[in-house]
Amino acid sequence: MTNCEKDEEFVCISCVEEVRYSFVSHLSEALRRKGINNVVVGVDSDDLLFKESQAKIEKAGVSVMVLPGNCDPSDVWLDKFAKVLECQRNNKDQAVVPVLYGDSLLRDQWLSELDFKGLSRIHQSRKECSDSILVEEIVRDVYETHFYVGRIGIYSKLLEIENMVNKQPIGIRCVGIWGMPGIGKTTLAKAVFDQMSSAFDASCFIEDYDKSIHEKGLYCLLEEQLLPGNDATIMKLSSLRDRLNSKRVLVVLDDVRNALVGESFLEGFDWLGPGSLIIITSRDKQVFCLCGINQIYEVQGLNEKEARQLFLLSASIKEDMGEQNLQELSVRVINYANGNPLAINVYGRELKGKKKLSEMETAFLKLKRRPPFKIVDAFKSTYDTLSDNEKNIFLDIACFFQGENVNYVIQLLEGCGFFPHVEIDVLVDKCLVTISENRVWLHKLTQDIGREIINGETVQIERRRRLWEPWSIKYLLEYNEHKANGEPKTTFKRAQGSEEIEGLFLDTSNLRFDLQPSAFKNMLNLRLLKIYCSNPEVHPVINFPTGSLHSLPNELRLLHWENYPLKSLPQNFDPRHLVEINMPYSQLQKLWGGTKNLEMLRTIRLCHSHHLVDIDDLLKAENLEVIDLQGCTRLQNFPAAGRLLRLRDVNLSGCIKIKSVLEIPPNIEKLHLQGTGILALPVSTVKPNHRELVNFLTEIPGLSEASKLERLTSLLESNSSCQDLGKLICLELKDCSCLQSLPNMANLDLNVLDLSGCSSLNSIQGFPRFLKQLYLGGTAIREVPQLPQSLEILNAHGSCLRSLPNMANLEFLKVLDLSGCSELETIQGFPRNLKELYFAGTTLREVPQLPLSLEVLNAHGSDSEKLPMHYKFNNFFDLSQQVVNDFFLKTLTYVKHIPRGYTQELINKAPTFSFSAPSHTNQNATFDLQPGSSVMTRLNHSWRNTLVGFGMLVEVAFPEDYCDATDFGISCVCRWSNKEGRSCRIERNFHCWAPGKVVPKVRKDHTFVFSDVNMRPSTGEGNDPDIWAGLVVFEFFPINQQTKCLNDRFTVTRCGVRVINVATGNTSLENISLVLSLDPVEVSGYEVLRVSYDDLQEMDKVLFLYIASLFNDEDVDFVAPLIAGIDLDVSSGLKVLADVSLISVSSNGEIVMHSLQRQMGKEILHGQSMLLSDCESSMTENLSDVPKKEKKHRESKVKKVVSIPAIDEGDLWTWRKYGQKDILGSRFPRGYYRCAYKFTHGCKATKQVQRSETDSNMLAITYLSEHNHPRPTKRKALADSTRSTSSSICSAITTSASSRVFQNKDEPNKPHLPSSSTPPGNAAVLFKMTDMEEFQDNMEVDNDVVDTRTLALFPEFQHQPEEEYPWSTFFDY
């Protein structure tokens, strides 16, 4: 990993030797789990802190100082800490986190002597909280105050990358991370690397890949990164391949800019081992294409909440600062950066330290005008890779075409001699330009940097290639002749532009000046000229005082001049290169005198030029496509345009003096004639390829020939023309307020009939037989004739309908909109395939049974309160609370379309259901919603084979000013771990209102209910879903129509999940217990198991720990009698553990645990031992204070001490070993046993066993107390039976246990107590380990200290009353 250990990601922990391997080791490990891997621990030994670690402390981003509690005020440690504090004050980027560990009476004294000014927090150990809580507090402080800045917004992106990786087939998987400069590609790649690298055999993170491979070469780079520590240099790439073809390798190539360089590395990456992962980050999409990477993740910017967090942290602004202006400034900065983390961080740091708001305002304005070098350098490095044409197109877009229609931009740039189709794609691939909703967009930073490139070319305004700043342009164009004190005119010479200028866009909103006649004389290469007013409320005042314009550049492609003040363009202007003339509201009477060459002209817009009288000059524009003369009230004639074969759009609306049109081009698509004096069109007007006529005509003969005519709008009288409609497909008579009736149209082939807004229309004789869409909104029709069976959409919104015919036979009807039909009284029935029903604002009191196919119901303002059960409801805004509650409960309690016995195929086809209602209407309903935007649920084991899907309840808080919820939706992410421990996920998007429908203003918070049978984990063996421990996590995110996450103004406040399974009785929907709410966290296999363990009863926890450490892979019949001997219920306990996936029992009766389950058991044991270790010192002190009399009383319990040979069979009593320790001064450890009938009979007998110092073949046994029960006569039989159950296993166990039980790893040759002192069958099994060496590492104890880890394994010993056990015997030496 090259150059990865940045100073700002480096943590130094300084401590004393006493806490290095206890508290500090836990702290460093917790930091690593949080993703902070660069942690260095320095120990104060021989002044090492300042001799060797001082440089590291000064370079570290965070310095954690762990001060011991027993510090004396004169201690050198305090002097060192004071110096570290001073170092921190000199280095503002470094954070110091002091930790006062341990109790001390002197603490208050020396605390007062230290100056903690500037430190955000001091952490102290307290009696009332454990070390684990203290560690958690420190880690949170370190992460949130220093490291969190770089990881804001990373979590959700990590999930998407993980999902992208998991979807790829097993083999060599590749992912590309793509995004604009500063968007967080490297940060995201590092986060992925930190999270995944431990799962690979080899891994490397190569920063600045192009530079690294140029400096070191391919072989050296590969050898250094993938095989560190090699002595021999790899001379051939084939040798490297041979060494890595069996390894799972993670390779991250960061910031690959040269596609060929990346391809040279990856073209043969098939030599990596299966399961390898290659991640490439680049700002150029072509890199991924050439490298053969198809899975590309585009990094999005931070959302509003994340951006605010980052800015406040970077600028050190507190969240609760009350000054409104300061908050407004932060919003402006965040909006300007538009989610770019680099910009937000840089601007935040630039504003940091500014005390006055005015200073911050000024600094921000300067930054906008001149972006910081770090940002400019990041963007300009991409700009420098462009070709000359690509640079010109980028600069044109940055200066002039932000947000313009992409086809419009392409048309203009093509006229300039570029190849924009290809070159704009290059800009998109390099993240300089984006295309959204068919418009060209640049990030605000990109636009400003592009403009800065232009301004940086020269300080002379007249020599800049592109001009857009109004005051600079005014300086060049303003008329400069003035009278001085009534004297003759004096001329003030000014620069008047130069041939370098290629584009000039002047916004005249705030300007008032006179243009000089020769303003454009020197701009010989001007391609783009636009003079406009961005504020429609301002009337610009820019005139020619001399009444003339001498010239315009002949290289113009765009001439856009609003309110042009002259009667014509200069006569010497040659428009042969013009692509567009756009001169609305001009004073033009004609364009020019005579005929000009207009071979490049595509568009001419002279709308509202009230003085225009003649446009005959356009006949030479053979490539003309659009003519817009709307509002030219003096224009009397439209020329014959039959030769303009490319003309497709003509707008003559408002040209009241035009009485006729002689000829219409054959390829016309749109003809707008509203407000003209035209009463009729010639027969030649209507052609077979006409697609739309928009007019106010009274007669259109020859329509029968219009086989492709689709639309005819605003026809005033239909009687005379219906017979000529021929093969008309769509007839629009919208807003024909004079139309009163329509004849029988049964013989027409109409598919669409739109009568919306025909307020006088009160009768229809008959409908076309193939009609599919009928719009009657706003009509006066009270009754309609029989509807055609082909009908798919009926919209009668706001009509006067009182009744409808029976629609049960309309099997194709999908949408029925009766909203606002205030006079509608009854509905006889609904079609069986109806999907959307709207009757908001009706007076219906009762609605017939709704079909099962229904998906959307809008009942806003409806008086109906008797709606039947169905699947998808929306917009219950004003129904009563009781009705809404009934709907919630019905939806969550009955799913009648999934009856018992349904096949999986039919279940997969089952429809979804959903509905919503204002949250205030269901306040009294019981839905078990949890706070937060995510929830973890557990599947009952009995439900898993019948699982169909989930019902999800989500409560969303909308902002008060939210007006239109049409595009609002909710994304649900379902995550679980499969039985192999791998993370899995499913994501579904639910849009809460049907697209295209008008949604009332959302005024209240809403509760949404969704169900989808596809939200179901994959099936494992049989029909059992492949879910580990039955735990599933659901997360909910507000989204828009484009499935992009909305900002934090939309908040998921509560959520819940219910299970839907195949019906087992009268209902098929069961409640499920909500385990916990998390917001949000990543659920690993370990966390799933730990939640299952924490929910167990105490005895089941003990059973799990026994099995995890002793009985893995053993037969149930073998384990059962042994566990029963310690008073545990084996049969029920094993079933409980199996139900929550903590163990599994194989078909041949073996208890099986996965490695993760065993690991968790060991960690739990280790954690309990750490907790107990805190009690040892206090226990020792307490025992040392025990009165001698009490100690003698305990010693008097010793009944006898005997010596027997080590090979002796024993005393035939049943004993259980519960501890062992090394004894100072002795070669042999001592074992501690208690009677096996302690719990069943209350027996207090114990014994201690140790080898003799003089004869190692003899055992010294000390018996304490007596048994209170007869000697068991069946013990040997029981042991024999257990041995016969698995004789081979038992013999192997006995051999292992006899020589290795609790062997101290520091003394491998030291003989230990044999297990024969305990009954062979029981003892052998009791101390059999799956991995004895690993267990010994976790269970080792210091000399003369109780083996508390063993005590943790047997918790019943921890709670034994004091009089039942001679504690003093542990401290005899």
Swiss-Prot record:
Ligand binding (ATP): 179-186
Superkingdom of the organism of origin: Eukaryota
Residues covered by the NB-ARC domain: 170-421
One GO molecular-function entry: sequence-specific DNA binding
Residue stretches of each LRR repeat: 498-522, 535-553, 554-575, 577-598, 621-646, 665-688, 742-766, 768-793, 831-854
Record's keyword terms, sorted: ATP-binding, DNA-binding, Leucine-rich repeat, Nucleotide-binding, Nucleus, Plant defense, Repeat, Transcription, Transcription regulation
Disruption phenotype: Loss of resistance to C.higginsianum.
Known DNA-binding region: 1204-1272
UniProt region (Disordered), positions on chain: 1300-1323
TIR domain: residues covered: 5-146
Motif residue range(s): Nuclear localization signal: 988-1005
GO biological process, one term: signal transduction
InterPro entries: Apaf_helical, Disease_R_plants, Leu-rich_rpt_3, LRR_dom_sf, NB-ARC, P-loop_NTPase, TIR_dom, Toll_tir_struct_dom_sf
Localization (cell): Nucleus
GO cellular component: nucleus
Misc. remarks from the entry: Ecotypes susceptible to C.higginsianum or R.solanacearum, such as cv. Columbia, contain a protein with a premature stop codon while the longer allele found in cv. Nd-1, cv. Wassilewskija or cv. RLD confers resistance.
Summary of subunit composition and partner proteins: Interacts with PopP2, a R.solanacearum type III effector.
Function of the molecule: Transcription factor. Interacts specifically with the W box (5'-(T)TGAC[CT]-3'), a frequently occurring elicitor-responsive cis-acting element. Also acts as a disease resistance protein involved in resistance to fungal and bacterial pathogens, including R.solanacearum, P.syringae pv. tomato and C.higginsianum. In presence of RPS4, elicites an EDS1-dependent hypersensitive response.
Record's protein name: Disease resistance protein RRS1
Organism: Arabidopsis thaliana
Gene name tied to this protein: RRS1
